[in-house]
Amino acid sequence: MVFLDSIDFSGMNYPNFEGLQLLPLDDIILVADDSHGIGIVGENGSGVYQKLKSFKPKELIVCCSLGKGYGVQGGAVFGFTERIKTLQKTAFFGGASPAAPVGLATFLDSEEIYTQKRVILKNNIKLFIDGLKRLNRFVYMPKHPSFSYAEEASSNHLEKNKILITNFRYPNEDSDLLSRIIISAAHKKEDIQCLVRHLNTLSEN
């Protein structure tokens, strides 16, 4: 049995999963957390399930939060029919709280909106990448909106200019600083250009 995060922010897994493909997957139950992929990557935001299924593991289970890509307070589990039926019979499943009906109703009725937002997100990611003078300072994955880096001076500069990013020490206060820029569909063209301009200014210094 192998457990993994589909999006590990280092590029080791998604999109090609090179290391995973070296394993004897026909003998392995593969369990993947796709919380950072569902709604963003894959055809129509379907995540990595079909990609991982194409590797033909002995069994595939994909779980995810719907809160990141879809903004729904709930979760999902995808897998082979027999496994899902088995999970449905457990006390863990029976005692779990479902997503709020209003959230699920909105989710089901919003396919067109999600599609439009993914197009905007794709364009925003391209605008960000194309505008940077030093893209190699970032660790990122194709078509994914997260860009990690290790320059504390950049984080300080952005904060001073009222640009907020993910920036904290994890998993404890003695750990290395985790800095990550997340592009979203809510960002306007001017937002991306402003961010790029500040990052490029740092590159020149």
What annotation goes with each model-predicted range?
Residues M1-A32:
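Active-site phosphate-binding strand-loop segment of PLP-dependent enzymes
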Residues S10, G37-G39:
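Catalytic P-loop NTPase motifs of RecA-like helicase/translocase cores
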Residues E43-F55:
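Basic, amphipathic juxtamembrane/active-site segments
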Residues L52-K85, A99:
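Active-site PLP attachment segment
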Residues E82, S97-Q116, I120, N124, ...:
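Structural motif of enzymes handling amino- and sulfur-group chemistry
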Residues I120-K162, S179, A185:
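Conserved PLP-binding catalytic core of the aspartate aminotransferase-like
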Residues N172-N205:
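PLP-dependent enzyme catalytic core of the Aspartate aminotransferase-like
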